Amino acid sequence: NGRCKGNVEKIREVSMLGAIIGDIVGSTREWHNIKTEDFEMVPTGSRFTDDTVMTLAVAEWLMTDSKHKPETLVACMQRLGRKYINAGYGSMFRKWLLSEHPQPYNSFGNGSAMRVSPIGLYANSLEEALELARISASVSHNHPEGIKGAQAIAGCVYLKSHAAWSTEHYKINQFVTETIGYNLDSQLEDIRNEYTFDVTCQGSVPIAIMAYLQRYNYPPEKALRLAISMGGDSDTIGCMTAAIAAAEKLNVIGSDFDDEVIKKCRALLPTDLLDINDRFEGFISKPLKQSYYLHGYLYAGEYPGDRKNEVAKRKIEHMVHFGIKHFVDLTVEGELKPYRHLLPKGVTYMRFPIP
């Protein structure tokens, strides 16, 4: 029956990937840690960092390569990374970005986890989220802990956007403790003063997840404030926490943050990065916006509509990925080109001529 469980909500005019909001809010606190949840969200000096650039590189990869090839991801990461080379990368990753033949370097830094959230929004199952997260991490952060950190965040984002509201926090906790193997027993308020800067996955990803879980029944800003208040690698912890907290049903992104916060964050992004953010939102929501939920089934609401078979085939693949398994044409005879031959197995097609 696909993803849709009701009428698709209208996308708000003001939106942004939660990971980017968290990155920007944490950007002024990375080297000037604060240990309080009472702070200005987007003060003067706030900026996007490498977390934002690489998050959008992953989003671009998902939009442009339906085969999800590692070499395509590398190309997306290097293109954006080189354009914004002073965004704040670690020394090893900077070398990787500039290398003519980049190779993974066995890193377990949190760079693999900070960029992965678009995968959780895109994936059609938890298994797909974990596999794509593995691919996305392995091109650079191929240490088992680097892969585990990416899978943890991708899985949490997927579950947050798919589980029922009453059980999402339980399912995320269960997934992280049983599948990933992180210990989530600490109360962050109790360890806040002793927590220090740690850029490893195992030292920062659980903190980010606990910040969400310990504020799950509040607006996402509360979870982000708790995450930033821990100190440490604030922009990346904020990026990961906000990515989870902002994930919503039906893939509407970032709409629970205050409009003014979102507007300030959007104003800090250059046009090309903002374009990727907005295109990705359309990419993950358009198939559902242009479909119909009827008697328990999801029907395509738009003819894939290109005379060129390859273009039509890509559109169909996009729709099917997001759970649309039934296609219906209501058409005057001769008006639309049939496309039954382009549909994969397991998909139904009905064509009703209009007199």
Task: Tell me what each language-model feature is.
Residues 287-288, 294-355:
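Cysteine-based protein phosphatase catalytic domain of the PTP/DSP
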Residues 1-284:
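Structured, active/binding-site neighborhoods that engage oxygen-rich ligands
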